[in-house]
Amino acid sequence: MRALLARLLLCVLVVSDSKGSNELHQVPSNCDCLNGGTCVSNKYFSNIHWCNCPKKFGGQHCEIDKSKTCYEGNGHFYRGKASTDTMGRPCLAWNSATVLQQTYHAHRSDALQLGLGKHNYCRNPDNRWRPWCYVQVGLKPLVQECMVHDCADGKKPSSPPEELKFQCGQKTLRPRFKIVGGEFTTIENQPWFAAIYRRHRGGSVTYVCGGSLISPCWVVSATHCFIDYPKKEDYIVYLGRSRLNSHTQGEMKFEVENLILHKDYSADTLAHHNDIALLKIHSKEGRCAQPSRTIQTICLPSMYNDPPFGTSCEITGFGKENSTDYLYPEQLKMTVVKLISHRECQQPHYYGSEVTTKMLCAADPQWKTDSCQGDSGGPLVCSLQGRMTLTGIVSWGRGCALKDKPGVYTRVSYFLPWIRSHTKEENGLAL
């Protein structure tokens, strides 16, 4: 009973003192306070210290900038409160049991410097292209980009910007080798990606296939995407688009002036032969594509010059997560596969003689990620001599991410003469 009375008396003293002017005492002890925060303690518990933060900051060390609504650069020093991914899913807390098993978490020795703590706010501790967080997807946490915009997108330049030019294979975000499997991305990471849609009689529009911008006026895709509806008037093309059915800042919309399908295209039970198409595009104003941080051309390879087998390459698209899915994902996805030799791909338990020298095979060594329905026509890009190069066009395959059934791609280096003969603008192509 005496112990209980003593505790009650202590509580009364603390509460009464907190109403006075001497509740907090600034102390020289190091609390690691940031952004002008001061280290303080209570009069009766001088061995307990914490940070007293300026108005716009919060967190244990005043490390959270409550006023920050956008990120600068790649967001490495972003300390705002965005806490959802681009699909609107909540981020996991950096100190949650699930995240503590990952590489970046709140218990790291450098967590404070990286902005990680007892919160679920988006951060960029590993210098990726923008802030991200861990999101629970199924049974495991996945790295996902965050719903927070670049401060530069909302700034008006004080002086006229330099004229932008197309520089094939260059992207504002650094190459990342980490669409069954894979991860969500934004168009800045694949600025040559073209989203192709088909108009219907009732006025509705549906996504058909992907494509790649090879010059300001030309997109290359796969013939099988258009063979059933070959009228150019049926199609529209978007460049600079990250989301399937909603607007992306800076995107451009184009009509199809000319649709060229390969005259020798054919399809077997499974394989597609000469599966390549060209779309000449123009806007309502009659202009071709204009370069920006979200719109860029992809380099074309030289004749028969393909990366060596085993090279890691990127595939991009709005393809389904699984072949049995009904809907396409709303956000653009990207993943990495490795090129497979023709000899291996022509093995009987792979595809046998269905694979020809006009095709390339690529797959994830663990068979966990692959192109899938809806990725057709999209790019397979590989780094070649320091530039991202269009090595293949998504064409066909059995299922999605099935063991011993890699994705098969149209071999772009084989079709260079065909591309040049139809575009008639070799100097304007991204060679």
Swiss-Prot record:
Post-translational modification: Phosphorylation of Ser-158 and Ser-323 abolishes proadhesive ability but does not interfere with receptor binding. Produced as an inactive single-chain protein (pro-uPA or sc-uPA), is processed into the active disulfide-linked two-chain form of PLAU/uPA by a proteolytic event mediated, at least, by TMPRSS4.
Stretch forming the signal peptide: 1-20
Subunit structure: Found in high and low molecular mass forms. Each consists of two chains, A and B. The high molecular mass form contains a long chain A which is cleaved to yield a short chain A. Forms heterodimer with SERPINA5. Binds LRP1B; binding is followed by internalization and degradation. Interacts with MRC2. Interacts with PLAUR. In complex with SERPINE1, interacts with PLAUR/uPAR. Interacts with SORL1 and LRP1, either alone or in complex with SERPINE1; these interactions are abolished in the presence of LRPAP1/RAP. The ternary complex composed of PLAUR-PLAU-PAI1 also interacts with SORLA.
Biological role: Specifically cleaves the zymogen plasminogen to form the active enzyme plasmin.
Boundaries of every Kringle domain copy: 69-151
Disulfide bonds: 31-39, 33-51, 53-62, 70-151, 91-133, 122-146, 168-299, 209-225, 217-288, 313-382, 345-361, 372-400
Matches recorded under InterPro entries: EGF-like_dom, Kringle, Kringle-like, Kringle_CS, Kringle_sf, Peptidase_S1_PA, Peptidase_S1_PA_chymotrypsin, Peptidase_S1A
Protein family (similarity comment): Belongs to the peptidase S1 family.
Positions of the UniProt region annotated as Connecting peptide: 152-178
Residues modified by glycosylation: 322
Regulation: Inhibited by SERPINA5. Inhibited by SERPINE1.
Domain Peptidase S1 positions: 179-424
Reactions catalysed according to its record: Specific cleavage of Arg-|-Val bond in plasminogen to form plasmin
Molecular function via GO: serine-type endopeptidase activity
Keywords carried by this UniProt record: Disulfide bond, EGF-like domain, Glycoprotein, Hydrolase, Kringle, Phosphoprotein, Plasminogen activation, Protease, Secreted, Serine protease, Signal, Zymogen
Entry annotation: catalytic residues: 224, 275, 376
Protein location: Secreted
Chain's gene name: PLAU
Residue span of region Binds urokinase plasminogen activator surface receptor: 34-57
Pfam families, alphabetized: Kringle, Trypsin
Enzyme nomenclature, EC number: 3.4.21.73
GO biological process: fibrinolysis; plasminogen activation; regulation of cell adhesion mediated by integrin
Protein name according to UniProt: Urokinase-type plasminogen activator
Cellular component aspect of the GO annotation: extracellular space
Originating organism: Pongo abelii
